[in-house]
């Protein structure tokens, strides 16, 4: 679906135009066209392909979706793919995709499965005509910067979730629920990392070595995006390591609890084994057993059993088994 199609000259909005008028405006000096599509149909993308002479491989990637974040050059056109990540109202992490085609006199952005609008990007860019005057390279930076900035709230939410889980790990009664929550958190971290890591490498092409002509005037701005991605990469690595450690600590706590239960069971088994041993001795059917004929034999036997059990109980209690 077409969101908007606007022509700009010298950094200022020239006119809202129809797709069939694009070819007229891109011919004007110091003018470029910025087209935004959302969940575009095949027909819409193919129409833009003909209008801007886009490379068929890049168009194929934009149509099929589910692409790894990347930045590629096709002649005079720069093609970028980014993944978006955001939480739904039901606290599920969902991903979307933004594809950008940038040429010397046009910018085409296509967003698929992205709930958040990019209209704010256009509004902010139009408030800075001296920057928008730099052309499609600046527009590409503005869109990329907006997508990357939206990673920060997601990472902060993941950090808060991990802090909450860590606080519960050392509480009594460790349960499988904590392991499940940490495992799901690791999956979310991996999802965000799959969006950040490839994009970090891709943006690196725009700030190191040979820079595509479209981005020559905005190289320092892409450096800012690169720095943000580096910070996110570091934060995600730290989160993943902490989550792994949390699982290991959780399993260690579970092992310790099992060991404590085993020690208590072994201690009580030892106490009852001693009592059973005495009862078994005096329960043997021998005719010559002096204790059986003794008047105080029964009370004495009970006393010995009680004393033995008491001593064992004291020793186990002192050792921390009971």
Each model region followed by its residue ranges:
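Hydrophobic alpha-helical transmembrane segments and their immediately adjacent juxtamembrane loops
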Residues: 53, 227-322
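Peripheral, non-transmembrane regulatory/ligand-interaction domains of membrane transport proteins
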Residues: 1-238, 291, 321-322
């Amino acid at each position: 679906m077409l969101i908007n199609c606007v022509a700009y000259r010298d950094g200022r909005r020239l006119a809202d135009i129809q797709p069939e008028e694009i070819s007229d405006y891109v011919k004007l000096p110091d003018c470029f066209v910025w087209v935004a599509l959302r969940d575009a149909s095949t027909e819409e993308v193919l129409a833009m392909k003909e209008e801007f002479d886009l490379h068929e491989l890049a168009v194929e990637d934009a149509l099929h979706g589910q692409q790894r974040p990347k930045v590629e050059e096709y002649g005079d056109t720069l093609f970028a793919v980014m993944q978006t990540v955001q939480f739904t109202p039901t606290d599920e992490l969902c991903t979307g995709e933004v594809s950008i085609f940038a040429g010397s006199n046009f910018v085409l952005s296509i967003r698929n499965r992205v709930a958040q609008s990019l209209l704010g990007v256009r509004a902010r860019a139009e408030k800075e005509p001296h920057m928008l005057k730099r052309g499609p390279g600046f527009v590409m930076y503005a869109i990329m910067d907006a997508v990357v900035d939206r990673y920060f709230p997601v990472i902060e939410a993941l950090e808060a979730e991990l802090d909450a889980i860590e606080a519960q790990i050392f509480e009594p009664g460790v349960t499988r629920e904590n392991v499940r929550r940490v495992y799901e958190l690791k999956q979310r971290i991996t999802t965000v990392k799959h969006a950040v890591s490839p994009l970090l490498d891709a943006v690196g092409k725009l700030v190191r070595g040979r820079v595509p002509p479209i981005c020559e005037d905005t190289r320092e701005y892409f450096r800012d995006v690169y720095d943000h991605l580096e910070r996110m990469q570091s934060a995600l690595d730290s989160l993943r390591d902490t989550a792994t450690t949390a699982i290991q600590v959780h399993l260690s706590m579970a092992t310790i609890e099992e060991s404590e239960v085993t020690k208590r069971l072994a201690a009580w088994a030892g106490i009852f084994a001693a009592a059973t041993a005495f009862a078994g001795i005096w329960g043997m059917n021998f005719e010559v057993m002096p204790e059986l004929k003794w008047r105080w034999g029964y009370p004495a036997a009970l006393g010995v059993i009680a004393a033995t059990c008491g001593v064992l109980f004291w020793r186990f209690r002192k050792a921390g088994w009971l």
